[in-house]
Amino acid sequence: MCYIMDKVGILKSDRIEQTTLLVNQNKIEFMRQSMDNIKFMRMDLSSYLITPGYVMLDFSLHSLLPFQDFKQQIIRYLKKGCTSLLTVVDIKYEKELVSNVKKRRHLMINSPIDYFMAVKLSLKSLNQSVLRKCKQQQVSIVFVEINKDDRLDLTSWGWIRDAMFSNPITLIPFTSDESLSPFKKNRLLQEWNRIVREHRISSLYEFLEEGTPLSKEILMKLGIYPVKGDIRVGNKLNYNLYKLEELKYHIDGKPIIQHNEISPTFTSHNGKLININGNILFLPGKGEECFISISGRFIPQSASF
């Protein structure tokens, strides 16, 4: 079925512009400023701001989670406008990787939204073998836990880089050391960044926050954008709608969306409304696992390392 999302506000170059979307078979077929000459059913969205469906990070899910607990945790994300989840599997020993990833995939069969798989392991567990197993399991995101006592310079980074060659794997620094002051945490991150840049390893240069939308820049680096995290022709219909009158604005007119204070009025996943004013439609099994074919897409080569 074709219909038109008419005159919805979209953020472009730090300001809101009105655009009109032609939707066909739950995909965006056409976008332009107006489509007054096209005769299809219209939805007047002139009082709304549209954003892409959010991709969010989660460390809390685990394979032994009962369905009702799993459902409640996922609903928290749906209320925030999340339409794709980056779920992280904790790996203590390399031999656990295959079985733990398999268990997480079994848990996510019930997911109502799309999801990407990632693993988290300690620095001492990071080696060529574990990265090859990640490739075999089609896992392209690896969180590396680093703490104050870790000696980053003692890791065989040259071997790590060789194992990542031609693999769409991105390393992400992570720390759970609560004893670290913000200053020491920043020093630890600086040391990580120095090492991965020196060895030209595909990595993020910041710690990521759970339960908040991942930025466009992060999604680009991971290889998730533009399939997710963008409103563009050809993409599936994953979006959030916010009432313009409920938003706060910067002096320059750019809207402020504080995700801990305001939730989207509507959320669509693949063309199906799953959030209407906080009322959640939980459809088990409607989500699909997504895979990353190329990391760092649409990033200039000079900015990749």
Placement of each model-derived feature along the sequence:
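Short secondary-structure boundary segments
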Residues: 89, 146, 244
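Alpha-helical scaffold segments that flank or form the walls of functional sites
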Residues: 27, 38-117, 122-136
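Short secondary-structure boundary/hinge segments and terminal tails
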Residues: 95-96, 152, 285
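Short, charged N-terminal helix-start/capping segments
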Residues: 11-20, 45-57, 74, 154-173, ...
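A generic structural signal for alpha->beta connector loops
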Residues: 39, 112-114, 168, 264, ...
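Active-site microenvironment of metallo-dependent hydrolases
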Residues: 1-37, 57, 61-64, 70-86, ...
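Positions that flank functional sites
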Residues: 92-93, 149, 249
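Histidine/acidic residue-rich metal-binding segments in metalloenzymes
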Residues: 99-113, 117, 124-207, 220-236
